[in-house]
Amino acid sequence: MKSLIIVNPADCIGCRTCEVACVVAHPSEQELNADVFLPRLKVQRLDSISAPVMCHQCENAPCVGACPVGALTMGEQVVQTNSARCIGCQSCVSACPFGMITIQSLPGDTRQQIVKCDLCEQREEGPACVESCPTQALQLLTERELRRVRQQRIVASGENPL
């Protein structure tokens, strides 16, 4: 069953710990320094509200269809990347409705690297951003759990869902 990261902006304090944890969780893909800091999520701020934004792992991901060389594919849990196939055309960047894909060249390397959330598939503990958030503003939920949370919020708000 597909899992998703949900964010509660009311709990986010904008500390960017999630961004740092993300970079640390992907050390083989970049050097850890201020010049090359490539988190796969970005904390967005609007007035007094902040919230991390990341790939939504769309079911019919427009980025997958936009890539002319198949560097992005649909996996069971996430939109998967294959940077070895990437030609740097940035079609996927343009196609992403959330602006959450970056194409990056690392210093001293001519290859292109696709940078997007992969739900930290390589980590047994799950996404580093979820684990590191000091206020638990991020949660990893299955689609079933997400439906349950949505129903609870509707009931709590007293809204008529119809």
Curated annotation (Swiss-Prot):
The alphabetized UniProt keywords are:
4Fe-4S, Electron transport, Iron, Iron-sulfur, Metal-binding, Repeat, Transport
Where is [4Fe-4S] cluster 3 annotated to bind? C55, C58, C63, C96
Q: A Gene Ontology MF term for this entry?
A: 4 iron, 4 sulfur cluster binding
Protein name, as recorded: Putative electron transport protein YgfS
What is the phylogenetic placement of the source species in the record?
Answer: Bacteria, Pseudomonadati, Pseudomonadota, Gammaproteobacteria, Enterobacterales
UniProt keyword rRNA-binding, yes or no: no
Q: Which organism does this sequence originate in?
A: Escherichia coli (strain K12)
Where in this chain does the record put each 4Fe-4S ferredoxin-type domain? 3-32, 45-77, 77-106, 110-143
Which domain of life does the protein's organism represent?
Bacteria
Where is [4Fe-4S] cluster 1 bound in this sequence?
A: C12, C15, C18, C133
Q: Where does [4Fe-4S] cluster 2 bind?
A: C22, C117, C120, C129
The family database entries (Pfam families) matched by this protein are listed as:
Fer4_11, Fer4_4
Determine if Ligase is one of this entry's keywords: no
What PANTHER family does this protein's entry cite?
ELECTRON TRANSPORT PROTEIN HYDN-RELATED (PTHR42859:SF17), OXIDOREDUCTASE (PTHR42859)
Entry's transmembrane regions: none
Residues annotated as binding [4Fe-4S] cluster 4 are: C67, C86, C89, C92
